[in-house]
Each structure stands twice: as structure tokens, then as C-alpha cells.
């Protein structure tokens, strides 16, 4: 049995725990919130025996083996390193950290302490993303990849009214690129590797974070054009265009409908049924790594997390988006 703690008492931790409930060797034993009352309420809700409002005290506790970090982006590195230095395995929400330097520090801490560290990028473990990879060769030489994750934020109305909530605060290393653009970039890295060049532009909000943008990754013979937005919504599918056909994906962050449209007019549906919650597979992978004494995922590798961090840092640089964490 792997005993888990969680940092964060929000909708994403609720969803993670609901997904992990189907994993036989998963047990939630500890909850952290800055509010002792909130920690206690969340622990009671999910039958966790321990509630903490002090991170140092929690890290030193022996009541859990691993921690799932779902705090604001700017806090990921500090919290992850703290827990790894106390011998705890860490599953950290995407994006791993604010920038490349912090990502490197997290990876170094994992290696130094001999613990598992994995970025919680759920997409790469989903059955239909794996099917996409399996059938990619059928479209011949790839000539273009397009993907978008554009979703009007539920917090943007407040921003427009003059209230800047966490989702749009540079102090927390937030913004469209970091929060949802990563769902386009990470799959591109998994499918095609590190790009030769990165070009980016976008719209900066008055708070100092990006509201939307486009990232173009250059590869040998093709480009990946990736669009992200928290101030508008897109319904366009993702496409991997090859010389012999095109793979059409309904949504890149959670593929459910995936088909190949061949140049000769044939249509092949390659999607498979997926009854599990989306976050189940990343939790299952993480638990398996711990049980098998493996320190790094073969799918969400350190190299892929670091490449993604480098791309996003370069994209932010070109957009003129600077976080306080960049100046630390």
C-alpha cells in the first residue's frame, strides 16, 4: 500500500482522489491546507487520518510515503524539493515549475534523494493518446501538427470587472501558456521531441500574465502550431498532417475521438473505449513506479519535462511575460 498526502484542497485534488480511488494500492492518509480548518474538513471528506497546516511539520511526518502537489505553479519547486529532501516521492501537477532553473532543481533533488518525481501530465497516459502514437506511422512523413487549448476561464469575468484572482496573477506563475498551453506543448514534445526553434507571440493582460497566445515549434520538415487562450474558446480539433493522411483528434488534452483521414478518401477510426477517469492513468503510473522501485517514468521523463519547461520559458521571453520567480 502506498500512503499518499495531498497539497491543495481544490477541484483538481477532488478529481485526482476520485480517479485514484480505483487503484488498489492507493491510500490517502494526509491533507495539507494553509487553513487548519479547511485541511480538517477535506481530510474528513476523503477519510484521511491526518490534517496539516504547516508544511515543515508535514514533510517531517512518517504518516505517508508520497505526495501529490496541486498548489499554485509558483509553489511547486519549493514544496517538491522540501518533500523530496524528506524522502517522499512526488507527483507534481503541470507545469512542473515556474521556469527551467526550478525544473532542474527539482530533478536534481529527486536524483539526490533517490525518490520518484513525475510531472502529472495526464494526456500522455490516456489510452487514445497511446493509440495515436501507435498509428502515427500510417500517415507517412509528418508535415504539420496543429493543436489548440482555448477555454474561456471561469475567472475571467471577475478580471474584466477589476478583480484579479489567482488564475491571472504573475506572482503565482500563472497565465494561459502555463496553465493550459502546456497541454499542447508537452504532447508535441512526446510525439516529436525537442524542436529546432521556438517562436511565440501573445496578448498580455494588464496583470502581467498572458491571456492567449500562439507557439510555433520548428522541426525538420514541418512545424507544430500550438494555440492557447483563457480569454476565448476554440472548438477546433487537433491535426497531425502527413503526406499520406491526417490524424484528426477532437481535443489534444483528452483525446476521445481519433480518426485517420487518408489521402485516398478512406476513413479509419482508431479511438478505443476509455471508461476510466482521465487522471486514473497518471496515478496508476506513479504508484507502479514506487512499487517497482523505478525512479523515473518512461513516458513522462525528466528530459521531456525539462524540454517543455525550456520551450515555455523561451515563449514567455518572446511574449515579454516575466514572473517574480524568474528573478529569484
From Swiss-Prot:
One Gene Ontology molecular-function label: nucleotide binding
Organism (species): Bacillus subtilis (strain 168)
InterPro entries: Gfo/Idh/MocA-like_OxRdtase_N, GFO_IDH_MocA-like_dom, NAD(P)-bd_dom_sf
Catalytic activity of the protein: scyllo-inositol + NADP(+) = scyllo-inosose + NADPH + H(+)
Alphabetical keyword list: NADP, Oxidoreductase
Enzyme Commission number, as recorded: 1.1.1.371
Keyword Aminoacyl-tRNA synthetase: no
Family label: Belongs to the Gfo/Idh/MocA family.
Record keyword NADP present: yes
SUPFAM superfamilies: Glyceraldehyde-3-phosphate dehydrogenase-like, C-terminal domain, NAD(P)-binding Rossmann-fold domains
Induction (record text): Is not induced in the presence of scyllo-inositol or myo-inositol.
Function: Catalyzes the NADPH-dependent reduction of scyllo-inosose (SIS) to scyllo-inositol (SI) in vitro, but is unable to dehydrogenate scyllo-inositol and myo-inositol. Is less efficient than the functional paralog IolW. Under physiological conditions, may primarily function as an NADPH-dependent oxidoreductase that reduces carbonyl group(s) in its substrates. Cannot use NADH instead of NADPH.
Protein name: scyllo-inositol 2-dehydrogenase (NADP(+)) IolU
Enzyme's top EC category: oxidoreductase
Lineage: superkingdom: Bacteria
Amino acid at each position: 500500500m502506498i500512503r499518499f498526502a495531498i497539497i491543495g484542497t481544490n477541484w483538481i485534488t477532488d478529481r485526482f482522489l476520485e480517479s485514484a480511488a480505483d487503484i488498489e494500492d492507493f491510500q490517502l492518509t494526509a491533507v495539507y491546507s494553509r487553513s487548519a480548518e479547511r485541511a480538517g474538513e477535506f481530510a474528513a471528506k476523503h477519510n484521511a487520518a491526518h490534517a496539516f497546516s504547516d508544511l515543515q511539520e508535514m514533510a517531517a511526518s512518517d504518516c505517508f510515503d508520497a505526495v501529490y502537489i496541486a498548489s499554485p505553479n509558483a509553489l511547486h519547486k519549493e514544496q517538491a524539493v522540501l518533500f523530496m529532501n524528506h524522502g517522499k516521492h512526488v507527483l507534481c501537477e503541470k507545469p512542473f515549475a515556474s521556469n527551467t532553473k526550478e525544473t532542474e532543481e527539482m530533478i536534481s533533488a529527486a536524483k539526490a534523494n533517490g525518490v520518484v518525481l513525475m510531472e502529472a501530465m495526464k494526456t500522455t497516459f490516456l489510452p487514445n493518446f497511446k493509440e495515436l502514437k501507435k498509428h502515427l506511422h500510417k500517415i507517412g512523413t509528418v508535415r504539420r501538427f496543429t493543436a489548440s487549448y482555448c477555454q474561456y476561464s471561469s475567472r475571467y469575468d471577475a478580471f474584466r470587472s477589476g478583480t484579479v484572482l489567482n488564475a491571472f496573477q504573475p506572482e503565482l506563475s500563472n497565465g494561459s501558456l502555463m496553465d493550459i498551453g502546456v497541454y499542447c506543448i508537452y504532447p508535441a514534445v512526446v510525439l516529436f521531441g525537442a524542436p529546432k526553434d521556438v517562436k511565440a507571440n501573445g496578448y498580455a493582460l494588464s496583470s502581467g500574465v498572458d491571456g492567449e497566445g500562439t507557439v510555433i515549434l520548428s522541426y525538420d520538415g514541418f512545424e507544430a502550431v500550438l494555440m492557447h487562450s483563457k480569454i476565448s474558446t476554440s472548438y477546433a480539433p487537433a491535426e497531425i498532417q502527413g503526406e499520406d493522411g491526417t490524424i484528426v483528434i477532437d481535443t489534444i488534452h483528452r483525446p476521445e475521438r481519433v480518426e485517420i483521414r487518408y489521402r485516398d478518401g478512406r476513413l479509419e477510426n482508431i479511438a478505443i473505449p476509455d471508461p476510466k477517469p482521465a487522471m486514473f492513468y497518471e496515478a496508476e503510473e506513479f504508484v507502479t513506479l514506487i512499487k517497482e522501485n523505478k525512479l523515473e517514468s518512461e513516458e513522462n521523463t525528466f528530459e521531456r519535462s525539462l524540454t517543455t519547461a525550456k520551450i515555455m520559458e523561451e515563449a514567455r521571453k518572446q511574449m515579454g511575460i516575466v514572473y517574480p520567480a524568474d528573478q529569484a
